[in-house]
Amino acid sequence: MDFWLVCYDVRDDKRRRKLAKLLEQRCQRVQYSVFECPLPEKVLTDLLHRRWLKELNLKEDSLRAYPLQRQSRSQAKIFGSPDLYEPPDFLIL
């Protein structure tokens, strides 16, 4: 399973709320506009182009997805909550 760190900067409240709800369907919110997403790259790319980017005004907003390596995730230093997200052993698609 691949992990992605997805973050956004969206100016409009309505667009921001809609994008956050979409991300929460597949990802774990770790900060206000930052999510950890346990998704294969193909699924992430599909969601980006079919769902998430459609909610943005790309002249004003931005969305970024950074790959997280398993080793870097295990070395993460976390203070406060939430804890490091560990997805279930299986995913129903």
UniProtKB/Swiss-Prot annotation:
Give the protein's recorded name: CRISPR-associated endoribonuclease Cas2 2
Q: Which family does this protein fall into?
A: Belongs to the CRISPR-associated endoribonuclease Cas2 protein family.
Q: What is its EC number?
A: 3.1.-.-
Q: Which HAMAP family match?
A: Cas2
* Binding-site residues, Mg(2+): 9
User: Can you state the subunit structure given in the record?
Assistant: Homodimer, forms a heterotetramer with a Cas1 homodimer.
Q: Name one GO molecular function term.
A: metal ion binding
Its domain of life reads: Bacteria
- UniProt GO BP: defense response to virus; maintenance of CRISPR repeat elements
| Key word Aminoacyl-tRNA synthetase present | no
Family annotation (InterPro entries): CRISPR_associated_Cas2 (IPR021127), Virulence_VapD/CRISPR_Cas2 (IPR019199)
The signal peptide annotation in the UniProt record is: none
Which terms are listed as keywords in the entry?
A: Antiviral defense, Endonuclease, Hydrolase, Magnesium, Metal-binding, Nuclease, Plasmid
Q: Which cofactor does it need?
A: Mg(2+)
Function as written in the Swiss-Prot or TrEMBL entry = CRISPR (clustered regularly interspaced short palindromic repeat), is an adaptive immune system that provides protection against mobile genetic elements (viruses, transposable elements and conjugative plasmids). CRISPR clusters contain sequences complementary to antecedent mobile elements and target invading nucleic acids. CRISPR clusters are transcribed and processed into CRISPR RNA (crRNA). Functions as a ssRNA-specific endoribonuclease. Involved in the integration of spacer DNA into the CRISPR cassette.
